[in-house]
Amino acid sequence: MNAIYPGTFDPLTLGHEEIINRAAKLFDNLLVAVAVSSSKLTMFDLQDRLKLVEIISNRYPNVTFTSYKGLTVDCAHTNNIKTILRGARNSTDFNYE
């Protein structure tokens, strides 16, 4: 089974890294998808965020990464992925999703 882990990753945190670590063990393939968000003012530009994600992704043979614009579901569909992975720090995050 394949999964997509989308986010702006601005910045990539230890929490994100832990989710990638766990997901790499659960799924055959994991796509870490770095969102280009025109509505968010980011601390790091897209290229810097991709570099950080690449460093983590390279630790796992079944983890790849990409950037995308638009809807997460469209990115998942384009990559033939049916499972979207999300992290939730607390009930507020869970309710938001």
Specify the residue positions occupied by each region the protein language model found.
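Nucleotidyltransferase catalytic core that binds NTPs
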Residues: 1-97
